[in-house]
Amino acid sequence: MTKKQELAIVGGGIGGLTAALALQRAGLAVRVFEQAPELAEVGAGISLSPTAVHGLNHLGLRDVLQREAYAPEDQVVRHYQDARPLSDINRGQSLIKQYGERYYLIHRADLHDALAAAVRANDPAAIVLDHRLVSLKQQGDRVHLTFSNGKQYEVDAAVGADGSRSVVREQLFGPGDPQFTGYIAWRGLVPMAKVPPGVLNPPSGIFVG
């Protein structure tokens, strides 16, 4: 019997877990190494384009999106200072006709939880917590990983999904700080009672300025 290829994914965020689920479905043995002592996701809502929705559907998350996400029919672009409408975007039937799927809004934590549950359903031991990568080396046809807790692993391949200050990237290409692009996005959660009347009609909007 041919042994399954073993892959390590460094980073247990949305990107790392999505990669893990896809590789599991391809028949590979996957370990996700997350530096935090428990799996959690911070942030607010994120948008899922029809292309992303197709990908998540392929990974078996269609029911999760239909249950946890919101699919707006329309979206209004508003000025960030006074919320006046600037333009309208149809997010419903026009996207279905063009791309075959809807546009969804979902809380990051809900998507993250669903991905983690799906990965663990395939292999309860797939996600390894409290493992912060300190070094990664190619040794022959294997990749050797060393973690801050002293543990070491050898795998056939490794995927770096450890964020903007990636240890994997630094090991491969040397040190380098993230470069500011000039764009800023403000994210947060506001109680519905404090939202001015009319701002959430339709209930999906983008504030720019």
What are these regions (language model features)?
Residues 24-44:
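Glycine-rich FAD pyrophosphate-binding loop
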Residues 15, 38, 165:
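Conserved Rossmann-like nucleotide-cofactor binding loop
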Residues 6, 29-31, 151:
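Structural signature of beta-strand start/N-cap positions in the alpha/beta core
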Residues 44, 48-118:
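Active-site-adjacent segment of FAD-dependent monooxygenases/related oxidoreductases
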Residues 19-28, 55-58:
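A short, Lys/Arg-enriched amphipathic alpha-helix followed by its capping loop at the start of a domain
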Residues 2-15:
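Beta1/beta-strand and adjacent pyrophosphate-binding region of the FAD-binding site
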Residues 82-85, 104, 113-209:
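Conserved FAD-binding catalytic core of PHBH/FMO-like flavoproteins
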